[in-house]
């Protein structure tokens, strides 16, 4: 039997590195989250596209808060901050406990691209998944044209497993997707 998401509440809410702090996103972060999701550069490879208005974002973030309030969290939505400045979002969605797997996603503010933030935040979430949640596998997908995300996923040690044809409904049309994963036994970088 695996108890993959039952560690103390304080460990669930904050992840830190020497530069970044990841905290569970909430409605108090609404203005930043809406701004971040409204950038067309950020939404280019996002299947959710740009939210119509702040109320759409509010509903999403409210559902995140509901997920975070559960005793056993199944979906983590973290705000990434550098110092006091929010710079992005990263999430970990857990699958059925029997499979011990999760899927990660992230969005970084365009002004913060190419600064190693996504890589550093992803490493923190991988540590959470493998070291604390005792996952066996963490996966991620990205559009084949999303060269920045491809570099991030490979930099943290994820392995490209395959290509899904026309699986992502992007604002520009259907896109192929690369599927990546890392196992608990794989080297992490």
Predicted regions and their residues:
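Conserved GNAT-fold acetyl-CoA-binding loop/helix
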Residues: 41-63
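Short helix-to-loop capping/linker segments positioned immediately adjacent to catalytic or ligand/cofactor-binding
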Residues: 45, 67-69, 114
